[in-house]
Swiss-Prot record:
It catalyses: a quinone + NADH + 5 H(+)(in) = a quinol + NAD(+) + 4 H(+)(out). The gene is nuoK. NDH-1 is composed of 13 different subunits. Subunits NuoA, H, J, K, L, M, N constitute the membrane sector of the complex. This is NADH-quinone oxidoreductase subunit K. One of its GO terms (cellular component) is plasma membrane. Its EC number is 7.1.1.-. It comes from Shigella boydii serotype 18 (strain CDC 3083-94 / BS512). Belongs to the complex I subunit 4L family. It is a multi-pass membrane protein. GO terms for biological process: ATP synthesis coupled electron transport. It is found in: Cell inner membrane. NDH-1 shuttles electrons from NADH, via FMN and iron-sulfur (Fe-S) centers, to quinones in the respiratory chain. The immediate electron acceptor for the enzyme in this species is believed to be ubiquinone. Couples the redox reaction to proton translocation (for every two electrons transferred, four hydrogen ions are translocated across the cytoplasmic membrane), and thus conserves the redox energy in a proton gradient.
């Protein structure tokens, strides 16, 4: 069994990597991938904590987080597809410009 500290450190590293990808990248698709990594890192923390204390609540929260991530990914990808059809790119700087 993995110690609690190792699992939480791994989860924190994954969360920071996702946050870094979210902040540094300018492409919306890569920003969405970074957000997915952050959601999965928090779900991993729930599973590790639940396993450490012998509770099944961590696994239930993992299922909830995965369903949330699936809904977020499907809506995000649909919006990205529409944005790509209208603007022909996914750069965040071109999206934030106002017309007029």
């Amino acid at each position: 069994m993995i110690p609690l500290q190792h699992g939480l450190i791994l989860s924190a590293i994954l969360f920071v990597l996702g946050l870094t990808g979210l902040v540094i990248r300018r492409n919306l698709l890569f920003m969405l991938i970074g957000l997915e990594i952050m959601i999965n890192a928090s779900a991993l923390a729930f599973v590790v904590a639940g396993s450490y204390w012998g509770q099944t609540d961590g696994q239930v929260m993992y299922i909830l987080a995965i369903s949330l991530a699936a809904a977020e990914a499907s809506i995000g990808l649909a919006l990205l597809l529409q944005l790509h059809r209208r603007r022909q790119n996914l750069n965040i700087d071109s999206v934030s410009e106002m017309r007029g």
